[in-house]
Amino acid sequence: RQRFEHFHAGENAVAVEAVRAAAVDPAAPWVFVAGPVGSGRTHLLIAACQAAIDAGRTAQYLPLAGLRGSRAAAIRGMAGSDVLAIDDVDSIAGEADAEHALFDTFNRYRADGCSLLFASVAAPVSLEIALPDLRSRLGSLTQALLKPLADVERRQVLRDHAAGRGIELDDTVLDWLFAH
């Protein structure tokens, strides 16, 4: 399961804490998580939703890149939760309807005192968001920039996942995996 205790933070401990705080504390600043593919953005957003639920809040997760049909309608349909985690913000860049829907959702959640979390492959300043007000609002959030794990940490992640399934990975196997 994608929970905070299963996330190997490495150099990202401050970012993880910012996301956790935003999930469980309505007064905490909202967070925009940015990092390359495989850095754990999605894991953190799903973990945040689970932490919010564990804290007695309601939460929803919306992966924009995987949506078929109108992303604007999907964004507008996300309402009524204490925490909304929106993944793949970069995927709506240049989609006027989706950008406006996200802008409206941002304002609605702020007015309702709810929490929003966002994730993307790049920080808001680097996204090609056409709507200036949305770009500005996203840029005003706490920025959690994820760094990829070092190889030694990635090896430990693989060992831990395998151990959870009763498999022991030795260095020879890991050397082969990393080479291929």
What do these predicted ranges mean?
Residues P124-G139:
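Short regulatory helix/loop adjacent to the ATP-binding pocket of P-loop NTPases
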Residues A27-L45:
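Walker A/P-loop nucleotide-binding motif
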Residues L141, R155-E168:
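Conserved AAA+ ATPase "sensor/coupling" helix adjacent to the nucleotide-binding pocket
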Residues D54-D82:
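AAA+/P-loop NTPase substrate/partner-engagement loops
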Residues L141-E153:
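Conserved AAA+ ATPase "SRH/arginine-finger" region at the nucleotide-binding site
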Residues E168-H180:
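Short conserved motifs of the RecA-like P-loop NTPase core
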Residues R1-V16:
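Dynamic helix-loop-helix/coil hinge segments at AAA+ ATPase domain boundaries and subdomain interfaces
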Residues A74-A119:
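Conserved nucleotide-sensing/catalytic segment adjacent to the nucleotide-binding pocket
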